[in-house]
From Swiss-Prot:
The keyword Amino-acid biosynthesis does not apply. SUPFAM superfamilies: Zn-binding ribosomal proteins (SSF57829). The gene is rpmF. Residues 1-35 are annotated as: Disordered. The keyword Ribonucleoprotein applies. Keywords: Ribonucleoprotein, Ribosomal protein. Pfam families: Ribosomal_L32p. This is Large ribosomal subunit protein bL32. It comes from the Bacteria. GO terms for molecular function: structural constituent of ribosome. The lineage of its organism: Bacteria, Pseudomonadati, Pseudomonadota, Gammaproteobacteria, Lysobacterales. GO terms for biological process: translation. Belongs to the bacterial ribosomal protein bL32 family. One of its GO terms (cellular component) is large ribosomal subunit.
Length: 64
């Protein structure tokens, strides 16, 4: 069982936890569709940086 050698001070504990904070997701808006998506990811419609890069099931049905 792990046992600490000496007590950890509140300052040391706080310095260790300084990098544990959560940050908000970086979101972008697609210029073509206006859809919000994660940075460097395609939208649900299959657009990336304003261009259609992948054929989605919903767009295949709409084209028929």
């Amino acid at each position: 069982m792990a046992v600490q050698k000496s007590r950890v001070t509140p300052s040391r504990r706080g310095m260790r936890r300084a990098h544990d904070a959560l940050s908000a997701k970086q979101l972008s808006t697609d210029p073509t569709t206006g859809e919000v998506h994660l940075r460097h990811h395609i939208t649900a419609d299959g657009f990336y940086r304003g261009k259609k890069v992948i054929q989605t099931k919903t767009s295949a049905v709409e084209e028929d």
